[in-house]
Amino acid sequence: MNALLELKGIERSYPAGEQQIKVLDDVTLSIYAGEMVAIIGASGSGKSTLMNILGCLDQPSNGEYRVAGQNVAELNNDELAALRREHFGFIFQRYHLLTHLTAEQNVEIPAIYAGAAKAARRQRAIELLGRLGLEDRIYYQPGQLSGGQQQRVSIARALMNGGQVILADEPTGALDSHSGEEVMAILKQLCEQGHTVIIVTHDPKIAAQAQRIIEIKDGHIMSDSGTQVSRKITQTPSLTSKISSIRQIFGRFNEALFMAWRAMVVNKMRTLLTMLGIIIGIASVVTILVIGDAARASVLSDIKEIATNTIDIYPGEDFGIDDPVSKQALKIADADAIKVQPYILAVSPEIEGQMRLRKGNIDVSSKVTGVGDEYFQVYALRFAQGIGFSLDMIRRQGQVVVIDKNTQRKLFPHQKNVIGEVILVGNMPATIVGVIANRESAFGNSKLLHIWLPYSTMTSRLMNRSYLDSITVRVKDDYNSKDAEKMIVQLLTLRHGKKDIFTDNVDMLVKAAEKTAHTLQLFLTMVAVISLIVGGIGVMNIMLVSVTERTREIGIRMAVGARTSDVRQQFLIEAILVCLVGGVLGIGLSYTIAFIAQLALPGWHFVFQPIALLSAFACSTAIGVIFGFLPARNAARLDPIEALARE
């Protein structure tokens, strides 16, 4: 009969400074299926190290170890995990149950890593616990169970995937005599059912209950009572209800997500404090994007209210150059020539001056602008009362005037409707035909008085001149204002025979404002991103602490068959989940901030663009991956023996 477990010349040494301490020396041993073996020895004899090598938790420094003919040294980490998962079941002296899980959930862990279907593993866990007399303790957590009951849960976990080989390390060491007897009776029964049971103990009474006793001292096998397998070996039951590889991967991810969520819920305060940096960072980024967009839209709306797609044409070379000849370059005919161009929506000649206004005993100074009939369309001005100028008023040099709200309040402090009233502009009587409404603007409203007359009235009746101070044109929306500006300059240069005018494109102001707003928003976003990175570093720090605190849990998971990728995935998912939940709460906080800001700034419109929300989630995920990778990698690299030894 071939040996199930075969060791040849096994040695195990550990470094101690510059020396090597040999714990096992030339151990040669064969264990057959169906045996109940007791390995007995005093503390420091090497019995626990031998058990760890038998259970593939540790590897020998020298020698050869075969499991069912397979040389263990030829297996990689994942293959070793599969061997532990599918062939071995561990029973520890201190039970090594996960305190935040129920008895059933603890028993299910090996089957989760084996990729078993959820319903099948749950049914088997309940069945095993029932067989061990714990049917009424299925949903109890370890802290609610006695020592004997916890050890029975540990036995059920060892049997979950079949447990062909049961490795029991001092299984009765932490139990009272009655509970110890019950555990030994269960182990004997398992041996009778076909399981290979290996007990590591220092107690001769426990060892005497085994069929075979191997004594170890100072790393050497001192005695071996020999193999006594006479019964027929039966097939050990195992959990065979597996799922397809794709569904298995999805199932493992789903379980890792569920376990990560449970770990977060168990440590609520720590999780919340970990999230705090992410919440503030995400809220900052989203709020800056939303409020920045609202502020930019408000400013641009105000600029466009002043004039959009407009070009101002001035005589001379530039502002501040006072040349009497160039000052007279613009004529009414130039405005007429521009008006017929296909890219022009509206044109208005302009003449400006400062004059006295009188009504009764009220005498004030006001800015006066002579304009064309399309001026109010060019500047998108709204009328509170009346209308603008008609072509007929322009042609007959009408003594009509449009005033602003400031002028109305000054000249008619107690009168609401002023249409048809006559005021003196200089010495010329003029009838009011319209009142311009105030603009609601982030820039505020002007306190100056401003009135408008037909430009023909200004040139002939008040100023006695034929040239213009400027011409304002509005370009059609489907034309590029920059191209239109070039064509206007070319047209007037051709008409005048030289370039004696210059232009001011209001769209350049709009673009400059957009650029400034974008730059400011980018700067504030970078500040918010820095806070987000700080939050990410906080997540990494807490996760590193979590790995240290949960080292024993990691060792337990590895002992029952978790791959390094399973451990890495679980801690990475925890980090990502913390960041995603923090991201959701951060977005919620930004909605609250925007709601408060909306109450304070009713003229602004706060819109949460999908791209901003998607960016927030993308940032949360990226931070979870980036700052969760190091803790996850550290967790996956832990040695299961060292991890299990941690308290």
UniProtKB/Swiss-Prot annotation:
One of its GO terms (cellular component) is plasma membrane. It is a multi-pass membrane protein. It is found in: Cell inner membrane. Keywords: Antibiotic resistance, ATP-binding, Cell inner membrane, Cell membrane, Membrane, Nucleotide-binding, Translocase, Transmembrane, Transmembrane helix, Transport. It is an enzyme of class 7 (translocase). Residues 5-243 form the ABC transporter domain. ATP binds at G41, A42, S43, G44, S45, G46, K47, S48. GO terms for molecular function: ATP binding; ATP hydrolysis activity; transmembrane transporter activity. The chain crosses the membrane at residues 272-292, 522-542, 576-596, 610-630. GO terms for biological process: response to antibiotic. Its EC number is 7.6.2.-. Pfam families: ABC_tran (PF00005), FtsX (PF02687), MacB_PCD (PF12704). PANTHER family: MACROLIDE EXPORT ATP-BINDING_PERMEASE PROTEIN MACB (PTHR30572:SF7), MEMBRANE COMPONENT OF TRANSPORTER-RELATED (PTHR30572). Homodimer. Part of the tripartite efflux system MacAB-TolC, which is composed of an inner membrane transporter, MacB, a periplasmic membrane fusion protein, MacA, and an outer membrane component, TolC. The complex forms a large protein conduit and can translocate molecules across both the inner and outer membranes. Interacts with MacA. Part of the tripartite efflux system MacAB-TolC. MacB is a non-canonical ABC transporter that contains transmembrane domains (TMD), which form a pore in the inner membrane, and an ATP-binding domain (NBD), which is responsible for energy generation. Confers resistance against macrolides. Belongs to the ABC transporter superfamily. Macrolide exporter (TC 3.A.1.122) family. This is Macrolide export ATP-binding/permease protein MacB.
